[in-house]
Amino acid sequence: MIKLKVLLLTLMVSASVNGQVVISEIMQSNIDCIMDDMNEFPDSWVEIYNGTSASINLSEYRLGESDDASEAWKLPDLRVNAGQYVVIYCDKEATGMHADFRLESGKNCEVHLFRGDAVIDCITGLKKQPAPNIAYGRMMKAEGLLSDQWTYFCSPTPGKANVAEAAEDILGEPVFDVDGGVYETKRNVKLTLSIPAGSPLGTHIRYTTDGTEPTADSKLYSTPITVSTPGVVRAKLFCKGWM
């Protein structure tokens, strides 16, 4: 009897996601991950998945930052086939596939999907996006169906199934041995690791000295950095499977 109840619950959860139109992936800060139909990089975006067995018209739906349907952006007149993904650019352009709002990259970002005045899916209480070009989306099940479990993706898949490697854990931040500020003389800036409890081995620091966001290809930190000219040192922790 217990096994039967668990099976029924699993099927009900699957139906709740894959039998409806849902939000499947978002990006709060898009620097250069995806280019829109205007050949520009939208500030943020939301991916919607048609999990029903029939085509839908997006004009029956709205997308917004609160649970107030009257303030939500009406989606354009576009037919979306069953099993198809579509990306809405959130950049305040308010035309075509471009919504009249942008997602907040800080804490407590919300996204609500409406059909008529009813909320049919939503994401609330989001944390600050760990870094630009990081997506937050539903994980895929082994059978190729979307799940109710959300995670971060270092390799976003706008307009496609979320098959990229998930990064469920977020690393801390490196600690400088001096406070931020302007210094007139040369000095060493020593970076030390600040690793969350339970982090795996292999965590390392990469940094830049031109103010840009460190990436996996940035210089690997191994010894104190000497800043000899005006510049901005930025550092970030990296570890496979983490962000």
Residue ranges and their predicted role:
Residues 4, 47, 61, 185-189, ...:
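Generic alpha-helical hydrophobic packing signal
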Residues 18-147, 217:
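Activation on beta-sandwich/Ig-like modules and their edge loops
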Residues 8, 35-37, 100-102, 125, ...:
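Residues embedded in well-ordered secondary-structure elements
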Residues 5-7, 52, 192:
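Residue-level detector of intrinsically disordered/flexible regions characterized by low predicted structural confidence
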Residues 79, 88, 131, 137-243:
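Short, compositionally stereotyped local motifs that mark structural "simplifiers"
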